[in-house]
């Protein structure tokens, strides 16, 4: 048994998109708010708030800012857990001091945990807290038990949902005790020791040239204009294609 993640492209309606973006903002606000409080305390006497302390304080913060109640409460709690992990990594010496999250980051996301069957994969839909049923095209049903879901938006505007599952069974392949050597090159993509050759389709070179042209077009547009935004999305989509 092991853990496995399943990433789906989701197609939220306009109301769901608005709520997703609002959740991005609220989880980012909570993270930055308590990072600021912990930062000031650390600068004063080299101590910090615990996760439990922040979680209790969040209840009062939601009374002060009613709009925090409009989004998934588990998502807000998860942002506190992420901050707590960031501090533990800092104090253990494995990472630098936690940084504030920026709304200008073109990749936005939040994570929510499975509880009381609040995350379910149904026929071409994923049920998510506060969002309800969100459309997906992929028919692949996640195996095992769902632990959490990460909802994200890429720079090209597309939305995704990644389901992290545990207790996933894998088929153990039988050993063949056969070996093959692979030589990767520029002229031929790969040459196997048994004589098989795979030609280099040069997709990367073609995509790189196309990307350079799109980036030149983007640089000529007025920043913030509709044409600039359309050109930016084209660049982001091609960058996503190249990275895949």
State what each model feature region is.
Residues 1-244:
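Nucleic-acid substrate recognition interfaces
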């Amino acid at each position: 048994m092991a853990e496995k993640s399943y990433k789906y492209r989701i197609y939220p309606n306009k109301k769901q998109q608005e709520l997703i973006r609002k959740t991005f903002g609220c989880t980012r606000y909570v993270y930055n708010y308590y990072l600021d409080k912990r930062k000031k305390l650390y600068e004063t006497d080299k101590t910090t708030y615990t996760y439990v302390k922040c979680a209790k304080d969040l209840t009062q913060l939601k009374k002060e800012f009613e709009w925090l109640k409009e989004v998934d409460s588990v998502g807000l709690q998860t942002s506190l857990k992420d901050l707590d992990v960031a501090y533990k990594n800092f104090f253990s010496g494995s990472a630098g001091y936690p940084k504030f999250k920026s709304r200008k980051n073109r990749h936005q996301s939040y994570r929510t945990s499975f509880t009381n069957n609040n995350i379910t994969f149904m026929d071409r839909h994923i049920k998510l807290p506060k969002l309800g049923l969100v459309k997906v095209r992929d028919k692949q049903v996640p195996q095992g038990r769902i632990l959490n879901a990460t909802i994200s938006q890429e720079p090209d505007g597309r939305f995704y949902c990644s389901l992290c599952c545990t207790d996933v069974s894998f088929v153990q392949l039988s050993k063949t005790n056969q070996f093959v050597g692979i030589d990767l090159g520029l002229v031929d993509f790969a040459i196997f020791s048994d004589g098989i050759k795979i030609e280099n389709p040069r997709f990367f070179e073609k995509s790189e040239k196309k990307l350079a042209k799109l980036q030149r077009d983007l640089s000529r547009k007025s920043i913030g204009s509709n044409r600039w935004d359309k050109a930016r999305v084209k660049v982001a989509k091609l960058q996503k294609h190249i990275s895949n």
